A protein has these predicted regions:
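Transmembrane helical core of 7TM receptor-like proteins
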Residues: 1-350
Length: 350
């Protein structure tokens, strides 16, 4: 998941954004200016890809299908299999749900734009997309933090694990993750929503990205930028430090274990550690790509789009490959549907 509270675009983005007019109130883009200002935005980040357009469409479509299918399977087995009672699967259920909704805020709209060449979005729709994309991204990091704490309790306090991770504590941790995300997201998006938009309405990105939309404001946004960066740092530092602390304590505890116990403990947190590394690594790569001059404007946007879907795409694959209980649960689920499919096929043949 890509955390986009940061303004990751270059300081002088002449190649990425159209220059704003000096008099926003007297300018008009495609005749959309009305007395009350801009009523919709035009998403133009992915409209000039020529032959790469269809390739990106196929990649996004297949990736989105896998994201929906893989995460839906995890949600189904985690909520219906009585053998998956560990709090870890409850948190994984919530992470998969967040991943599905997170990608749904942007990918369907982009796919529709590829097919129809209609890239407009209403002003309320733009800000709803912006808010939920950022909020769900932060929620994903917060849930990964909760899962790191869960692994810490399971490895460092195994005898007290069930007493600590009660149902009420699980719900409280998930509610805290959502509340933390809302707290970090709402100030920046609400400030951007209240700003005047009375001139250019072309968003140079694949979706209504916060920094891209804010460049269209016909007012001073220095305070907005400070607020956005402050809450972005808060979100990244809080989740990053807590995850790092959990794994440092896990590592210290593993040093006191025997080889067999150490391997077993590492196996229980390997999938989560892999997902965390990919999440922060992909966000860092996107940030760096906007600071390197070798990337063209279109390439930067493509990188941002693809990496925003990378973690939701890989999550179900990683957890399915690294978790034997989840693998067995998926096999049991598929075996329940297989006899019904065979019977239905026989009825058709007869």
């Amino acid at each position: 998941m890509e955390l986009v509270l940061f303004d990751i675009s270059p300081e002088s983005p002449r190649d990425l954004y159209l220059p704003l007019s000096t008099n926003h109130r007297s300018s008009s883009v495609n005749g959309t200016l009305e007395p009350h200002g801009v009523t919709f935005f035009i998403i133009q980040g992915l409209t000039n890809l020529s032959e790469r357009k269809m390739i990106l469409f196929v990649i996004l479509l297949l990736g989105y299908i896998i994201i929906l299918g893989g995460n839906s399977m995890i949600i189904f087995v985690a909520s219906t299999d009585p053998k998956l009672t560990s709090p870890m699967y409850f948190f994984l259920y919530n992470l998969s749900l967040v991943d599905m909704v997170y990608t749904t805020t942007t990918i369907p709209k982009m796919l529709s734009g590829f097919l129809t060449d209609v890239n407009t979005i209403s002003m309320p729709g733009c800000f709803l997309q912006m808010h939920f994309f950022i909020q769900l991204g932060v929620t994903g990091y917060a849930i990964l933090t909760v899962m790191a704490y869960d692994r810490y309790v399971a490895i460092c306090n195994p005898l007290r694990y069930t007493a600590i991770m009660t149902r009420s504590i699980k719900l409280l941790l998930i509610m805290g993750a959502w509340g933390f995300a809302i707290f970090c997201t709402l100030p920046a998006t609400s400030m951007t929503w209240k700003r005047p938009y009375c001139g250019p309405n072309v968003v140079r990105n694949g979706w209504c990205d916060l920094s891209s939309v804010r460049r269209l404001v016909c007012a001073d946004t220095s305070v907005d930028n400070i607020v956005s960066v402050s809450f972005a740092i808060l979100a990244l530092l809080t989740t990053g430090v807590l995850i790092l602390t959990s794994y440092v304590l896990i590592g210290v505890s593993m040093l006191r274990m025997g080889v067999a116990q150490r391997l077993k403990a590492f196996g229980t947190c390997a999938a989560h550690l892999t997902v965390v590394s990919i999440s922060y690594g992909s966000a860092s790569f996107v940030y760096i790509s906007y600071r390197v001059g070798n990337f063209s404007a279109e390439d930067r946007i493509i990188v941002s789009v693809l990496f925003s879907a990378l973690t939701p795409f890989l999550n179900p694959i990683i957890y399915s490959l690294r978790n034997k209980e989840l693998q067995e649960s998926i096999r049991r689920t598929l075996s329940r549907f297989r006899p019904a499919a065979v019977i239905a096929l026989k009825d058709v043949n007869t």
